[in-house]
Design a protein with these regions (language model features):
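A short beta-loop-alpha structural element at the N-terminal edge
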Residues: 28-44
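Acetyl-CoA-dependent GNAT
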Residues: 36, 44-105, 109-110
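Active-site acidic-Proline motif in GNAT/NAT acetyltransferases
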Residues: 109-111, 115, 143-144
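C-terminal "cap" of GNAT-fold acetyltransferases
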Residues: 140-146, 155-156, 162-173
Length: 173
């Protein structure tokens, strides 16, 4: 058990994948469920990340470390969705922790940020999580990452711990 807290009320229902939408840059984006079969494509996407855009040390920089990380997070009971437009441009995942919750991670390639892809990808991930029986989701985000914090609050995350240099946020789905 952990002393992590979650909101008392559920955030509501979220749409599940698949979905196709037009982003803020007029690009057609497809969101679909992903799993281990996406490993090679996701490694390729994560290799394209600028080291300066990495948060909390992930994704790794070295290809083998990226592959090991991707294989680890895609195994077991994780819930994962991917956004595509001429290849993989975003990935969001819920990874079960040792307690009752799932940790959320979301990554969007820099040239696709700020166009609404993160919002759609996050909503579809939470919808897929609801279908899989996930109830508690948490994440950590760097305090200076205002765009990410605004996105998480927009879909219903609440700050559950603000005692360190990172914020911990949680949602009940």
């Amino acid at each position: 058990m952990t002393d992590r807290t979650y909101p008392d009320d559920r955030a509501g229902s979220f749409p599940s994948p698949p979905a196709t939408f037009t982003d803020g840059e007029d690009r057609e984006i497809r969101v679909h469920e992903s799993g281990p079969e996406e490993s090679d494509a996701l490694v390729e996407m994560y290799e394209a990340f600028d080291p300066a855009d990495r948060a909390q040390g992930i994704p790794a920089v070295d290809t083998e470390a990226i592959r090991e990380w991707v294989d680890t997070i895609l195994s077991g009971d994780s819930v994962s969705v991917v956004a595509t437009h001429d290849g993989r441009v975003g990935h969001a995942i819920l990874v079960p922790d040792r307690a009752e919750g799932y940790e959320l991670a979301i990554f969007i390639l820099a040239e696709y940020q700020g166009a609404g892809i993160g919002t759609e990808l996050l909503a579809r991930l939470l919808g897929q999580g609801q279908e899989a029986g996930v109830e508690h989701v948490w994440l950590t985000v760097e305090r200076w990452n205002d765009a990410a914090i605004a996105l998480y609050r927009k879909v219903g995350f609440e700050t559950s711990n603000s005692e360190s240099f990172e914020l911990e946020m949680s949602i009940r789905i």
